[in-house]
Amino acid sequence: MTSINKVPPSIYTRSCPNCGGNISSQRLFNGSVCESCLKDDREFSNLSDLINILSENSNLKNLTQIRDVLEEYKKVEEIFGKLLNNSKPIGPQRSWTIRFLRGESFAIIAPPGLGKTTFGLIMSLYNATRNRKSIIIFPTRTLISQTVDKLAKFSELYSYSPRILYNKQSPTQTENILDQLKSGNFDIFISTNRFVIQNLSELSNIKFDFIFVDDVDAALKSGKSAKAILRLVGFTDEDIQTTMKLLRENIGEEEKFGKIQEIRESRLKDKIVIFSSATISRGNPILSSLMGFRPGSSVIYLRNIYDSYIDLTQTCKGQDFEECTLGTVIKLLKRLNDGTLIFVPIDKGAQYADYLASNLRDHGINVESVASSSISKLEKFERGEVSSLVGVATHYGVLVRGIDLPWRVKYSIFVGIPKFKFKIGEYMHPLALTRLLSLVYLVKNDDKVRGLLSYIRKRLRKISPAALAMLAKDIREGKIDDERLKEAYNLVNEYLKDNEFLKKVSDVGDLVIEGDYILMPDYLTYIQASGRTSRLYGANLTTGLSVLLIDNSRLFELLNKKLNLILDEVKWYSLDIDADKLGQVSLSDISAKITEERESLSKIKKEGNVESSSLSVKTTLFIVESPNKAKTISNFFSRPSTRSYGKLRVYETVLGDRVLIVAASGGHIYDLITEDESEKQDDNYVYGVLVKDSKFIPIYSTIKKCEKGHQIVKDLSQNKCPICGSRIVTDKTEVVDILRKLALEVDEVLIGTDPDTEGEKIAWDIYLAIRPFNGNIKRAEFHEVTRRAILNAIKNPREFNDNLVKSQIVRRIEDRWIGFKLSRKLQTEFWEQHCTSISKKNSKDEECKENRNLSAGRVQTPVLDWVVNRYQKYNENKKKYLIIESQDKSIFPFSVLALKKNGLSKNTQIIIHLEDINIKEEEFGPLPPYTTDTLLSDAANLLRIPASDTMRVAQDLFELGLITYHRTDSTRVSNVGISVAETYLKSKQVDISKIFRPRSWGEGGAHEAIRPTKPLDETMLKASIEQGDLELSKQLTFNHFRVYNLIFRRFITSQLPPLVVTKQIVRIRAYTKDNIELELDENKKEFVIGYKLKEGDEFRQTLQDAIYTLFRLYQPLDEKMKGKELSATITGTLNKSDVQLYTEGELISEMKSKQIGRPSTYAVIISTLKKRRYIIESKNLKKIIPTKLGMAVKEYLMENYKQIVSEKRTVKLLEKMNEVEEGKVDYLVLLKELYNEIQTIS
């Protein structure tokens, strides 16, 4: 349980877990129920104790079903104890069991050693004791034989003998088995996939209550076998066709999946279906849609590997390269000895693998080369009869994907960098084709190319690794039946003939051009192949050693760049065999550690006690706000399995010592209730807050939304919107129910909402809502959505910060009280006066009823005051100017403003005299990285993106893991951030010593400036997305890239030397042809004609995509123009003032400097003023102008309530709120002050 000094009192309506009534925060914090359900106010450490007390008091209501599940769980736990030497289910098994007992179907994707098959067998045994029938499906008869033996042993230990049937080979036995199945004379039927497909018509008519598919990857290897599984579950051919049609239809997601859900619920009914696998290479969308869950994929990014290298380009200098390479491999194998996988480049192929293996055997090394058909050699390696294997480094190769032996594989050796290599003009590998097509699209921006790319990607995603290998072979041999594929090859090869295009592609796309050949690092193959040395086995992630023999230095740089992008950071160790050194570490020590681990695993495997290694594995529910963030996080560790609960999608993945279940709350779940004054229960109720005995108790209800988009925060008696009468489509009560369900099945809950007061309050509300269902709940804090940051947050959870919670409570109540009180005044009293006045002026007789679109707020009112005052001063100082433009804009591109004179009008000829031309240099920057206010200001001023849009874009970029948290007033850069800049600069091949100036820009602390999380400029980001290196859960728009580019440039420039800006200053006069002197707005023009880096300027061109500049570059005027006259013309007039109107950016800067608002509210304040039509933005110059309504509102509020909404009072109050956040001020004292203040509003 979390430690909070004193729980802030509040009431949550309809949130009692037992009766659905109102309940206090203290009771939820205690893991209890409401007073109506239990008079005693006591604390419960677990749900079982609470249920027992309620049962004793005969007051068990909504928790009855959970009581039944927990009682059955105890029985299953007893079975586990009897069968597994008094062992209880480990974390994942407990989660699976609870889901099973709730009647859920789901997928288990977990590594060997977590007891998946054992779980399936025990649940089928449990089912048998309840007269329910089970079918367990395996890929091979060998596994069936082992399972029958295991079940026999289980039956003996449990003293219960279920009727077990299993399929045999002969037709007679098959017929006999089918007869027994039809008669129902069985409890457990054990079958192969093949038997199910061959006898589907008979088996689909037999009612199985529990279907357990032990190797779903094998079961889904073809559409036919996937269809067989669906038919066995009970789905008809018509169901499958309907689902296929619905998935293709262009209708809303809710309608589409609602119809599929109806099919699912009608067929599954009382059936439970569980898919189990250690890995899965592909999915089936129809099966996933109908089952309501999707199996995940193999865990390829979880690794504990020493990545080492030997640079053959240096060590083999002056020697025969092939002989030197062979000698290095021999020396390595004699040093490492046993358990090694050796990978040769795909361009050298299987022939070279055979050649290498033969040479190694000649040197006394026990090695075999393997291909896809070498099953016997793999088995020999597994038994230890062969010490090492040689195969081709290709992503579908048998050694890359087809071997999973954690107790056997120790080392990997790459004889050259894994790569795609092809001659320009030939048919390359289809995966290389997709990468090149994406680069063609980036450089040429050709929609036809984009269409081909999309088509080929979809095709490749649908086929199995074996089918991909066959396709690659056919293409290599010139057999291409697919016309669109052929068109893509022809198009790419045509482009590759253009040398200029090749240069552009190599700059953008991480490839090496060697003569007529193109080389691209195959980083996925390196990750997967080296990953064979570091596998999950139970709770253990084995240690591995990978040795990469570098045969191309540039390709190694590109490989490293890709690996850092995918894995966050890869540390490389230089390997010196003779010195026995791995970097500064002893090679012998690492080797001994690896060998000891493998011996331990071999012993566990031999003794058949796999589960004993998994006792520390636990299940963790990780809750975030947004679905995008949930998807991004779950994809860090694998392609997760998913399950759907209504509209909420839940992701499941594996992290070594835990199974991680990721879900999203969708932002705030609760908010202050919004009953009208007429609905008040008593006078102590003040706008959603109960005021009693000097206590302030906020009342919260779940947030609801209707079809028309209205948000409602009140308890409804009907499923109807009280505003418009439309149907309620979203009620966060559903989210609470789902999170409670998930919390019950896990060992711990971590709440990873945003790291600010709003995020803390969301987390606190979730904590209270689920506390009765799980007592082990903590806060996970992270400031960037990266693998490194998420792992750190999971490993280092913290307690809840009650000061942040109290601060948000104060802010929300203050916003509500002031907002509602003053808003009512505006909507009624003010509007009646204002509307009547307008009607009289317009000679109209209008009925001036209340105007509910009007609102006032503590912060928005001073900001409106600034806008109105600035506008008034602007008008007071406004003058009319003539616009004068040179007739030759190529010489002088600037407009000149002159005070209007009588007799001068449009098209009048004017002379501009260039009196003097000078040059000066100034240092510019570096500026610190962005904070929220500076980002919003720059985005508004430079990109003309409104603040509200910039915040939405930044929120997306944060959730997609591309930038750090965007609501911040810190300029600090962490060491991780500095390393991002360093990595980027190295990737641009600049001299770090000349140009890199690492700066932290602030003191230590949790918060950081807004910066990129990856060393990718805008062009590189686009390339990474197009090539599939980055798979984002949301498509980026034009504005996403523009804002990202701004953030990236500002950050990188903050780590560079200052810029030296060259300016030209031109002093001018203007007069008519009659020598009448004109009074100019300014008699000089100052503009930037160039810039350079103060140090390391030779790299400026290389870094042009990364340098932040606020200025536009102009062509310099020739100094010979000094004293010359230019012909010009008056082109128009404009009004100009000495006082400038605000832009959005300037208004935000003003809020920051005057300490009005916070990073999270700057955009909201401006957006609200626009929404209420108090201000508008001019079309061209984007200046903020108050409307007549805005000016009237400001005048009314300042005349009547200045003491409440003045800038001075607002700043003072915001300071006190910050002090609540820091624990310096009691939040109840501040609420009392606010309460007294609103009483003055009569």
Swiss-Prot record:
Keywords, alphabetical: ATP-binding, Cytoplasm, DNA-binding, Isomerase, Magnesium, Metal-binding, Nucleotide-binding, Topoisomerase, Zinc, Zinc-finger
Cell location: Cytoplasm
CDD domains: DDXDc_reverse_gyrase, SF2_C_reverse_gyrase, TOP1Ac, TOPRIM_TopoIA_RevGyr
Occurrences of domain Topo IA-type catalytic (ranges): 801-1242
Motif DEAD box in this chain: 214-217
GO molecular function annotations of the record: ATP binding; ATP hydrolysis activity; DNA binding; DNA topoisomerase type II (double strand cut, ATP-hydrolyzing) activity; reverse gyrase activity; zinc ion binding
A Gene Ontology biological process term: DNA topological change
Classification via PANTHER family: REVERSE GYRASE
Protein name as it appears in the record: Reverse gyrase 1
